[in-house]
Amino acid sequence: YTLSLHDALPILVILERQLARVAEAGFTCYVHPEIEFYLVERDADGRIRPTDHAGYFDHVPGGTAHEFRRRAILMLEQMGISVEFSHHEGGPGQNEIDLRFADALSMADNIMTFRTVVEEVALQEGCSATFMPKPFVGRPGSGMHTHFSLFEGERNAFHDPAGQYQLSATGRAFIAGLLRHAREITAVTNQHVNSYKRLWGGDEAPSYICWGHNNRSALVRVPMHKPGKAQSSRVEYRGIDSSANPYLAVAVILAAGLKGIEEDYELPAETEDDVWLLSDVERGALGIGELPTSLKSAVVAMSGSDLVADTLGENAFEFFLRNKRREYRAYDAQVTDFELGQFFPRI
């Protein structure tokens, strides 16, 4: 997994270097991703369509999705990758498999292996798997909501029994770092032009920079605390999508959170409302900003980021920016079926 640029750091080493910084601060990081994807097939005309018409948590024994998940999980477990949960997601043909918490570097490796396993098992089932963030108009996008915990030795550094929502000052500062640097890191966590159709397509995808307690419209969610589960205290970053490079995405997320801890960022007030239902004026009054609306705007935000440049290293940083600029310029040059349908008949 190396960049094709002379002297660029291997992608894995970028994460290793960030984890060394986390360790220098006295922490160990554990990660738990919820990985969404679609199972698709081609119809008689060659058009891509979902393999089923099921919905959220549908369970049809003997169906393609059920058998697929059973076989995929069995293969993952045989390879030493532990699965926490699996279920059918909200879109037709959409599935989710959640991997059990592991240290950040092992989890990045596991995610890469996971994708290969899912694609292989899908082919064995006579279909294909796609981790494309938004493959269908009007259907939910595929995210990779990722939970983070920092430990100091055997103690969860995000837990404080006296804190609001059992969240420690360390956890609050970590969230504050994620929020302050969210725009800068979005090009890495959402690296394709298609990623922004998910972020701004509704269906519980986060578009606005805020946090909340069990608020699924927020960019950062603090899950409900369960009594007796102090070691499970965690922070969920909901922006990242299923196409992200896990080594780079985890590295920049940790860099943002660690910056918040080191500089003791103050956490803004939580958002209790569904952010999508608020007006622009209401969001403005609450100080809630927007994530980038396109890859181009995300690249502009990243290009001025000392934090991302320091995390990736100069060569990888510049390579990434050049690569993404080529991508959005190639995309912008396309004339789409939508444009032809809208304008060709009447202009």
Q: Where does each model-flagged region fall?
A:
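Glycine-rich, acidic/polar active-site loops that bind/position phosphate-bearing ligands
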Residues: L3-S4, A8-I347
